[in-house]
Curated annotation (Swiss-Prot):
Keywords from the UniProt entry: 4Fe-4S, Cytoplasm, Iron, Iron-sulfur, Metal-binding, S-adenosyl-L-methionine, Transferase
Details of cofactor binding: Binds 2 [4Fe-4S] clusters per subunit. One cluster is coordinated with 3 cysteines and an exchangeable S-adenosyl-L-methionine.
GO molecular function annotations of the record: 4 iron, 4 sulfur cluster binding; lipoate synthase activity; metal ion binding
GO terms under cellular component: cytoplasm
Ligand binding ([4Fe-4S] cluster 2): C93, C97, C100
Pathway(s) of this molecule: Protein modification; protein lipoylation via endogenous pathway; protein N(6)-(lipoyl)lysine from octanoyl-[acyl-carrier-protein]: step 2/2
Reactions listed under catalytic activity: [[Fe-S] cluster scaffold protein carrying a second [4Fe-4S](2+) cluster] + N(6)-octanoyl-L-lysyl-[protein] + 2 oxidized [2Fe-2S]-[ferredoxin] + 2 S-adenosyl-L-methionine + 4 H(+) = [[Fe-S] cluster scaffold protein] + N(6)-[(R)-dihydrolipoyl]-L-lysyl-[protein] + 4 Fe(3+) + 2 hydrogen sulfide + 2 5'-deoxyadenosine + 2 L-methionine + 2 reduced [2Fe-2S]-[ferredoxin]
Main localization category: cytoplasm
Residues annotated to bind [4Fe-4S] cluster 1: C67, C72, C78, S306
Name of the protein in its database record: Lipoyl synthase 2
Broad enzyme group: transferase
Protein localization: Cytoplasm
Keyword Iron: yes
Gene that this polypeptide is encoded by: lipA2
């Protein structure tokens, strides 16, 4: 596992603060080409009044969103609907995944007030469904599991009718962490596999594919009422047969919901896009996934874990009842 230490001077007691690079571990990597995106991936720039209001509430509560940190292409659409995915435990991740635009380094201490701030923002936005994710916190004994649980509890207390979806890290080598999170009773537990196992060393070197599959399986064993969800990116050099095997692995873990989206390269220092997968291939993946038994599938070039999450959750409940 790669954990990056921040050795620059970020001491708030000094008058000058050294601005550290966002991805220090990638600084010496050779540049990779960034191809122009095809027409089916381009989106409108954000800027509506509702978008501005969402931004104001996020800023007032001093919160971090994965929408901004991960450079999500859907931020204009989602924030215009007052939908935001909150990223707890800071803006700095202890992992160094080759696809991700979130800052890498040694994070600061947890903000004990953050669960309440997230709950306040959820109430102000009037969310019927909220998605909460986090950076990886390998530096914490429980990987941040108790902080997840506290955030869920705070949202429940302030907005009891709001359904809660969490997108968790893998809690690798964090005994009891998953049990803590599941005991907090989120409605949906999402953990993304991100890519097929043959690409893990290059794309997700700090993670273990079958550990992630087992985490999803264990979550359902701990509480069968929870909906489980996972997502992957395509365009990283995977074969179709590998994606189909991944679907089988997730179904063997009784995962309910699969998302598949196009990988988009954040910078020249990140993993290159090996291929822009056309929309008809996403449609084929969706049909195959439904045939394999998933309750819900979202497979489009712009699909992301929390995109249309509220609408998808309502469909999930209806399909389980059917």
């Amino acid at each position: 596992m790669k954990v990056i230490l921040d050795l620059l001077n970020n001491d708030p007691r000094t008058t000058q603060r050294t601005e550290r690079p966002r991805h220090p571990e990638k600084a010496n990597r050779p540049d990779t080409p960034m191809e122009s995106r095809p027409a089916w991936i381009r989106v409108k720039a954000p800027g509506s009044a509702q978008w501005t209001e969402t931004q104001r509430i996020v800023r007032e509560n001093k919160l971090v969103t994965v929408c901004e940190e991960a450079s999500c292409p859907n931020i204009g659409e989602c924030w215009a609907k007052k939908h935001a995915t909150f990223m707890i435990m800071g803006d700095t991740c202890t992992r160094a995944c080759a696809f991700c635009n979130v800052r890498t380094g040694l994070p600061g201490p947890l903000d004990a007030d953050e669960p309440g701030k997230v709950a306040d923002a959820v109430a102000k936005l009037g969310l019927e469904h909220v998605v909460v994710t986090s950076v990886d916190r390998d530096d914490l004994a429980d990987g941040g599991a108790a902080h997840f649980a506290a955030t869920i509890a705070a949202i429940r207390a302030m907005s009891p009718a709001t359904s809660i979806e969490i997108l968790t890290p893998d809690f690798l080598r964090k005994h009891g962490a998953l049990e803590t999170v599941v005991a907090a009773r989120p409605d949906v537990l999402n953990h993304n596999l991100e890519t097929v196992p043959s690409k893990y060393l290059a794309v997700r070197p700090g993670a273990r594919y079958f550990h992630s599959v087992r985490l999803l399986q264990r979550a359902k064993e701990l509480d069968p009422r929870i909906f489980t969800k996972s997502g992957i990116m395509v365009g990283l050099g995977e074969d179709r047969s590998e994606v189909l095997q991944l679907m089988d692995d997730l179904r063997s873990a009784d995962v309910d919901f699969l998302t598949i989206g196009q990988y988009l390269q954040p910078t020249r220092k990140h993993h290159a896009v090996m291929r822009f997968v056309p929309p008809d291939e996403f449609e084929a993946y969706e049909k195959t996934a439904y045939a394999k038994g998933f309750l819900m599938v979202s497979a489009t070039p712009l699909t992301r874990s929390s995109h249309h999450a509220g609408d998808d959750f309502r469909k999930l409940r209806e399909r389980r009842r059917a």
